[in-house]
Amino acid sequence: MNINHHEHSAVKPGRPGSELFPNSPLGEQVEGIPTGRDVAWEPLVDYRRNGVSETTIHGAVAWAHGDEVIHSFGGNVLCYGRSMMKPFMLKAFVEELANLSWEQKAISVASHNGDTEHVAAAQSLLSESEWPLMLTPLDVPLIQFGRQVRRPRRWYHTCSGEHAAILRGCREKGWNRAGYTLPSHQVFDAYMSQIRRFLGEDWKPLRIAKDGCGLPTVSNTVAELAQIYAGLVRDKDADWIWESMVRHPDLVGGFNRLDSTILKAGEGTVIAKEGADGLLGLAIEHPDYPKGLGIVVKIAHGWNAQATWYVARAILGVLGIDLRNPYPLHRQKAFIVPGIVPDRYLNVLETIPTWDEWDPDQDRWMYDAELES
């Protein structure tokens, strides 16, 4: 059988839709949007086997005190905010959804696992007659235990709570709910107004894309995302976003999820929210940062819960917040690259181990192994 790689397998050249394909598998180069090796990623975590660097996790970290970026380690990297921005999407509906229960408020900003409690909370936001309006993709639970769910449903999707809350908010505002996921809808305009509260009225994104759940997501630098997250601290008592996440951390993510674990460790002083493809946003109330501290982590190759966990533990640790290590490594040892924190914290960073007493030391023999000549 002959295969012609010059012809599209799905749409033949000249047919409607064929122009949507890229011109090259190498991708196009757009001025002002770095790609590939031109993206200014920095090393964040180094996995070493008996002292030799075996795997290095690259990414970007930015710290913002109020509107000021105070530390950037790859902070100029351009990315999409993805689900990390759900608290700001829901800020457009804080008045309309003010009378919801705390569980309903928490699920509205969640990227949940799809457990029974998550689905029940999301479904409670709408009457059953409104369920067909929801446009989340069909999915199965993100994490499953015991009996496996094999039939995809919209409610299992990790963003179902957000979509249900948006639909309810649109109803309360009197907005047409048809097309609520489109960038031409009032939902997106309201979201952009929230972003401009923190970045300025003249700010415009370089790109608007469709997120995995169908809602629009816009491009920001990691430093801009940190500035936006610092705003969560300033808004802490102005709406219900902060308190709902602190009250019900397991609804925000779920069992052993990084953001849920950070919310518990912070004991009310930290908001954490994961985003797809390697994002973690932290809003921290800290006496050294009266204007609010926003920190955002982006992993270059996409979501890596373990590496992001090490970075988050180190960052929170230098600020006096104790986050446990991730579950033990059974291969290499993880080491933190010091650039993830400002220089003033380097001495403290050296006191935060990336290992625990019970971790097996399986990457070496406990005697000198030499080759015989």
Predicted regions mapped to residue ranges:
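Short Gly/Pro-enriched turn/cap motifs at secondary-structure boundaries
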Residues: 50-53, 156, 269-273
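Short glycine-rich loop/turn motifs
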Residues: 56-61, 192, 277-280
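Short acidic-glycine loop/turn motifs at beta-strand connectors
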Residues: 64-68, 96, 221, 284-290
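Active-site SXXK
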Residues: 81-98, 117
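Beta-lactamase-like hydrolase cores
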Residues: 2-5, 14-78
